[in-house]
A protein has these predicted regions:
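A conserved structural/catalytic subdomain of Rossmann-like adenosyl-cofactor enzymes
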Residues: 1-374
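Calmodulin-binding IQ motif helices
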Residues: 377
Length: 377
């Protein structure tokens, strides 16, 4: 902190225990809080660092701050498994960044905690004291299990959907005199045909009206000049703006989908800008690894587009031919199943008579001998 500029920011990765252990660590926490240095504490998932499974935090420190509160973020639930470790996804990181930048209170995720509250807790900064990110306990209704019906509290738990689709709840359920509900027949048809659902779908389509043209303008028309390093953020902001006012859709799930595609898109754009527009038409050998003489060897197996995959070209310019090939492949697969069934239905005596056209295991036909036999029929 001493070496920071007045407006400087320092982040430290620490084990979770520094937030609540006593002794000198408790004294350090007290001094940091009283001198208004702790801007945010971000709890990370366990097991995200190789070699250790202990939970960790990121502590954000500032030398000078205008506010005296501290943002507590519990990001321990946002991760995916990656081998033996956990891994933060791009969407998880973006959620953390946005919450910290906005210093936002988000239920079960983050909370601004006053210095007075921290004092009352004797400078204990253990994250669960301030943010409860635990799942709601699962409950079982014995009456419903024995006599049927849906408890009202289970339907109430879906309140975000009833708020997004007004009137749908009443159309889906009949409430019995005992207070339990019965779902009406064909709920999928009720949902898909309900006015509030149709309105939601229309609002969603309207929000993304022109999105394709926006992408074409940014990524196709300007592919040779677009600033690749800035473009993902521009696309993200556009998507977030379009999703404003659209309930139920997790904007960070949408960002994750964009980011996963952007990894490929950005590489393509950089290649076009480096090699020129004609690289879009270039093809390269498609190399695969095959066993040869007991060793793995890389060999060419056809060709592939350097930028545009062949399957996109085929589906766009030759849809009828692609459909015909798919139908032939389906027929071939069906014929193979029928041949297998035919072999399975043969008796041992039949297999002896057909030994010239069956393999050594008598479980499949040999193509060449079988074709020769058919010629003589």
């Amino acid at each position: 902190l001493y070496h920071l500029k007045p407006d400087g920011i320092m982040t430290i990765v620490l084990p979770h225990g520094v937030l609540f252990r006593g002794g000198e660590e408790g004294t350090i926490r007290r001094n940091l809080i009283e001198n208004n240095h702790i801007d945010a504490i971000i709890g990370l998932p366990p097991n995200i660092f190789f070699g250790t499974g202990i939970p960790t935090i990121i502590m954000v420190l500032k030398q000078k701050r205008d506010s005296t509160d501290t943002l507590i973020v519990d990001a321990s639930k946002g991760f995916v498994k990656s081998g033996k470790n956990n891994m933060l996804r791009a969407g998880d990181i973006r959620r953390i960044v946005d919450v910290v930048a906005a210093r936002a209170d988000v239920e079960k995720y983050s909370r601004l905690v006053s210095r007075d509250e921290i004092r009352e807790n004797d400078y204990n900064l253990n994250i669960p004291r301030y943010v409860d990110s635990s799942e709601d306990p699962e409950t079982w209704d014995i009456y419903a299990s024995m006599f049927g019906g849906i408890p009202a509290n289970e339907i109430d738990a879906l309140s975000p959907y009833w708020e997004a689709f007004p009137g749908l709840r009443g159309e889906l359920f009949d409430v019995q005199p005992n207070g339990y509900a019965q779902c009406k027949d064909d709920p999928a048809a009720i949902v898909n045909g309900h006015a509030s659902v149709l309105e939601f779908e229309e609002n969603y389509r309207r929000a993304f009206d022109g999105f394709g043209d926006f992408l074409h303008e940014h990524l196709v028309s300007r592919c040779e000049t677009v600033k690749v390093s800035r473009e993902e953020n521009l696309l993200t902001q556009d998507i977030f703006t379009r999703l404003d006012g659209i309930p139920l859709v997790d904007r960070y799930a949408a960002f994750q989908m964009l980011h996963e595609q952007w990894t490929t898109v950005s590489l393509d754009l950089e290649m076009i800008q480096r090699e020129g527009f004609d690289t879009i038409r270039a093809i390269d050998p498609h190399m695969v690894v095959k066993k040869k003489n007991g060793k793995d060897q890389e060999v060419q197996e056809g060709w592939e587009g350097r930028i545009i995959p062949f399957d996109i070209v085929q589906k766009t310019l030759m849809p009828e031919q692609v459909k015909a090939v798919a139908e032939l492949e389906e027929r071939l697969e069906q014929a193979q199943f029928e041949l297998t069934d035919l072999v399975d239905s043969l008796s041992e005596e039949d297999k002896m008579e057909l030994s010239d056209v069956l393999n050594d295991d008598n479980d499949a036909f040999l193509a060449t001998p079988l074709n020769l036999s058919l010629i003589h029929i």
